[in-house]
Amino acid sequence: MAVHTDIHPNDLKAFLTRYSIGSLLSYQGIVEGIENSNFMLYTTEGKFILTLYEQRISKDDLPFFCNLMQHLGRRGVPCPQPVIQNNGMMIGELAGRPAAIITFLEGEWVRQSNIYHCCEVGCSLAQLHLAAQDFSLSRRNTLSLVDWKCLWKRCQVRKDPLLREFGKKIDTELAFLEENWPSILPTGIIHADLFNDNVFFLNDRLSGIIDFYFACNDFWAYDLAICLNAWCFEHDHSYNLIKARGLLESYQKIRPLVPLELNAIVLLARGAALRFLLTRLYDWFNTPPGSVVVKKDPWEYWHKLCFFSNVGSLSELGF
């Protein structure tokens, strides 16, 4: 979450008349995150989250995201629910941006994960995958392998010295992944961004999953590989086998991986590291001036990419 677009109090009050969530008491921007502008709303009926969808999010995709959250919520996945307007619509417009209000989830995201958090994430990710099997809508992954090359070219336009540090390795990785990326694996809805700041906990128990705005149809095992990147490294860039084993075993108690997935998981983790390296690089150079947003360090994913590109066996991942 972040704030790229500010809103005027009078415009917000007028927008809220479309809902039955009480009168506005106060609101504040949420700094954490990258993609959209987010605000905490305090009304006479409680707390809510207002999201203004910025340029990377297509308005055409919003029904997919909102209906997916509804679908998952009905199947017991703890995620925010879109608040319906009085006219029955989920999406409105505010400050020239598509906008929606979702319910507020209790809990906090953890800055330093432990084995219990990783086990909870593994279990919940598998439950999410299974709960979405009968979801009727679909969406292409707009940040899949085919898109990484274009993203890298857009980064290189900047001619920044930082890019010279990454350049040769990224070119090599892109070529390798294009040559070896799997074409047939179990597929369904994936979250695609299940990082620690998108998962809430209460007393080490998972209480909510948020930010479904990268959700799409892709390999389930790729979603798991993203979680290995997001949850199983320490601040010194070392890979924590205990956390990884807990995450993987908890996932497989709900949905065991098939042999094809096991054979591909190292490659998928390598690809996931490259994906987040590239998006962080792009955002590092292209965050608009004046945005209230904390930019995320690309170097973190450089180290992860180097780790996964040198993994030689499943045991090194925690299997």
UniProtKB/Swiss-Prot annotation:
Metabolic or biological pathway: Amino-acid biosynthesis; L-threonine biosynthesis; L-threonine from L-aspartate: step 4/5
Recorded hits in Pfam families, A to Z, give:
APH (PF01636)
Record-level Gene Ontology MF annotations: ATP binding; homoserine kinase activity
Swiss-Prot/TrEMBL catalytic activity = L-homoserine + ATP = O-phospho-L-homoserine + ADP + H(+)
Q: Does the keyword Ribonucleoprotein apply?
A: no
Which GO biological process entries does UniProt record here? threonine biosynthetic process
Q: Mind telling me which InterPro entries this protein's record contains? A: Aminoglycoside_PTrfase, Homoserine_kinase_II, Kinase-like_dom_sf, Pseudomonas-type_ThrB
**Record's keyword terms, sorted:** Amino-acid biosynthesis, ATP-binding, Kinase, Nucleotide-binding, Threonine biosynthesis, Transferase
Taxonomy, superkingdom: Bacteria
Q: Might you give the EC number(s) for this enzyme?
A: 2.7.1.39
Q: What class of enzyme is it?
A: transferase
Family the UniProt entry places it in: Belongs to the pseudomonas-type ThrB family.
What this protein is called in its record is Homoserine kinase
User: What's the gene?
Assistant: thrB
